[in-house]
């Protein structure tokens, strides 16, 4: 993944494990704990974190410095055909933004 500071996907989960390795910059890996509260750890170059199947997670570039400088995060999702699912909160955000459900003719 290559992203600018402040960017990253919404909270989601996979049916397999997912491992993140910060290659450049600082990345915040967040997850929802058993009580539904968000926890996080900040990753610096070559730091690694892995999430088990079903754990809701997200990551964001939190690098300080120029807002137009990309940082790189490597991620590995296990399995031959893993699926992904956004959390209910993320789906509501997509609906409010008008991008879900997809409208005919829009890509």
Question: What do the PLM-derived regions correspond to, one by one?
Answer:
Residues 4, 23, 44, 60:
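Residue-level detector of conserved, well-ordered beta-strand and adjacent loop positions
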Residues 9-11, 29-31, 51, 57-66:
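Short beta-strand His + acidic residue motifs that chelate non-heme Fe in jelly-roll/DSBH
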Residues 5, 15-28, 32-34:
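Glycine- and acidic-residue-biased ligand/ion/polar-headgroup-sensing regions
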Residues 56-107:
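Double-stranded beta-helix
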Residues 1-14, 53:
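Conserved short histidine dyad/triad with adjacent acidic residue
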Residues 19-21, 33-53:
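Short acidic-glycine-tyrosine-enriched beta hairpin
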Residues 17-18, 47, 57, 71:
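Residue-level detector of short, conserved catalytic/binding motifs and their immediate flanks
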């Amino acid at each position: 993944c290559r992203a600018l500071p402040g960017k990253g996907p919404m909270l989601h989960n996979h049916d397999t494990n997912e491992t993140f390795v910060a290659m450049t910059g600082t990345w915040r890996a967040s997850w929802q704990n058993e009580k539904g509260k968000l926890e996080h750890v900040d990753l610096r170059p070559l730091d690694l974190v892995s999430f088990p199947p079903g754990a809701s997670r997200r990551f964001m570039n939190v690098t300080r410095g120029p807002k137009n400088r990309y940082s790189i995060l490597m991620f590995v999702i296990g399995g031959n055909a893993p699926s992904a699912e956004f959390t209910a909160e993320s789906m509501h955000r997509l609906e409010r933004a008008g991008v879900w459900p997809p409208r005919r003719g829009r890509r």
